[in-house]
């Protein structure tokens, strides 16, 4: 058996994108929750290219006396998971907790995650109770969770909730991965020996709007499908085989019917032939599109461009910053 190392310091990583209304309350509540831990702690706020005053508020919070807040400013918007990975590269804690900035997942749940991780778990996930989202968001989340569970074989109930805890070795291992499209909860579970979930409260969004539009959810679905498995390519091969066999069988049937009923019948079957042709063409375009998704993602991985560019890092009790690029 492997004994988990004791948790001496907790790092809370929070990606921020146009959350100026919620930031003061977020910082206050997260700070209060961390102070109750009885451990060393830090909060890392990552500005993901916000166009409002989020970055200024973050910098101000880092520069306050006795601040525990590290502000990381990206030069533009790279997406939630890339921003979290940028935060991971600057943490110093033994346990790292991710949290959304919209306050739908209460920061007051942080001590419960730390206590559960103290039992020896590598990853502690959460399941949102009484979700305060729209019916569309709930339905999309159920489909995504079902897809992930079927693909990975990991019976985790709520991959969409970013309130999660990871031990430092899991974080270090994820940082060594270089996929361009990264879905952190799934990647962490691949490396975790012991993972569990706990139920948490879920609140209605008080400030601003959700940053996940319909098209971003569709893109997330594509990311999950193409990053997790090659099963769609195998299904595509199976579909192609079925269509080929069906087309050959139909051709034989048409020849037999022509011989049996004469050429007049064949002329009357033109529309059926067009229908079959369009079916084949449609299947080919579906296959080409799916194949293109895989090839495009392989191309992005081969180019090995950085996931993000860190423009500034503001540490507590210091107004200095560094400029650097990270993978």
UniProtKB/Swiss-Prot annotation:
GO BP: any one term: 4-amino-4-deoxy-alpha-L-arabinopyranosyl undecaprenyl phosphate biosynthetic process
Periplasmic side: 257-269
Major place of residence: membrane
Membrane topology: Multi-pass membrane protein
EC number: 2.4.2.53
GO CC term (a single one): plasma membrane
Transmembrane region(s): 236-256, 270-290
Any one GO molecular function term: undecaprenyl-phosphate 4-deoxy-4-formamido-L-arabinose transferase activity
Localization, UniProt: Cell inner membrane
UniProt keyword annotations, A-Z: Antibiotic resistance, Cell inner membrane, Cell membrane, Glycosyltransferase, Lipid A biosynthesis, Lipid biosynthesis, Lipid metabolism, Lipopolysaccharide biosynthesis, Membrane, Transferase, Transmembrane, Transmembrane helix
Cytoplasmic side: 1-235, 291-327
Gene3D superfamilies according to UniProt: Spore Coat Polysaccharide Biosynthesis Protein SpsA, Chain A (3.90.550.10)
InterPro entries reported for this sequence: ArnC_tfrase, Glyco_trans_2-like, Glycosyltransferase_2, Nucleotide-diphossugar_trans
Pathway assigned in UniProt: Glycolipid biosynthesis; 4-amino-4-deoxy-alpha-L-arabinose undecaprenyl phosphate biosynthesis; 4-amino-4-deoxy-alpha-L-arabinose undecaprenyl phosphate from UDP-4-deoxy-4-formamido-beta-L-arabinose and undecaprenyl phosphate: step 1/2; Bacterial outer membrane biogenesis; lipopolysaccharide biosynthesis
Catalytic activity: UDP-4-deoxy-4-formamido-beta-L-arabinose + di-trans,octa-cis-undecaprenyl phosphate = 4-deoxy-4-formamido-alpha-L-arabinopyranosyl di-trans,octa-cis-undecaprenyl phosphate + UDP
Enzyme class: transferase
PANTHER family: UNDECAPRENYL-PHOSPHATE 4-DEOXY-4-FORMAMIDO-L-ARABINOSE TRANSFERASE (PTHR48090:SF3), UNDECAPRENYL-PHOSPHATE 4-DEOXY-4-FORMAMIDO-L-ARABINOSE TRANSFERASE-RELATED (PTHR48090)
Function: Catalyzes the transfer of 4-deoxy-4-formamido-L-arabinose from UDP to undecaprenyl phosphate. The modified arabinose is attached to lipid A and is required for resistance to polymyxin and cationic antimicrobial peptides.
Similarity comment text for this entry: Belongs to the glycosyltransferase 2 family.
Name recorded for this polypeptide: Undecaprenyl-phosphate 4-deoxy-4-formamido-L-arabinose transferase
Organism expressing this protein natively: Salmonella paratyphi B (strain ATCC BAA-1250 / SPB7)
Phylogenetic classification of the source organism: Bacteria, Pseudomonadati, Pseudomonadota, Gammaproteobacteria, Enterobacterales
